[in-house]
Amino acid sequence: MTLFSRLLTATLLALLAVAANPAAAQRKLTDIPAPNPTAELADMLVAEGYEVNLFAADPMICKPLQMNFDPQGRLWVSSSSVYPQIQPGEVANDTVTILEDRDGDGQADTHTIFADGLLMPTAVLPGDGGCYVANSTEMLHLADRDGDNKADQRRVVLSGFGAEDTHHIIHTFRWGPDARLFFNQSIYIHSHVETPAGVKRLNGGGIWRFLPRSLMLDVYARGWVNTWGHAFDQWHRSLVTDGAGGE
């Protein structure tokens, strides 16, 4: 792993692990301590050759769920203030935010709300003139047609994904080496998705694979419990984490 990769990985971990504004970060929670980025950074044990810094924090981001880089080096983050359960009468207004480090100092200088009005966007992945978003029971494509970093077109790409347990709804979008979009589903979900090739079903945990240009959807792997991380190595083998693999 190169030094750049090590620094990048550590920076991303810091982004998800740390929040800077206690009042905003806790979102009215009072039963856990308020976060303290300075203290948390001081307590981290960092391996030789690695570096950790705070890239972005609340209020730039709120309860981030997933993040991915675009070819320009900007970081797209999906956030949800209502996760894991929206309250009766509450209007869903979760967001996708673009973070950019323009001066190269390792900290986000700008943040732009690319889209709002979402419901528990558990995945975001830049591509095809905008981004793909997991929006509860749907996969959306949000497009920016005029180049102002604001979504001006919203399209439902796929629908019919289960939502019995919001902790297990579809999540973690990744581009695969075959130009397909891979994403996860966990065990307490039953999905029945209509496609041009017929209804595709996944009852329980697994990994989906999707080719946007043809709307071809299939199940890449089954039998998981709480699939979360998914990455590919240099031989295109899948490396998958399961949060409850021992069950």
Predicted regions and their residues:
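Beta-propeller domains with acidic blade repeats across secreted/periplasmic ectodomains
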Residues: 22-247
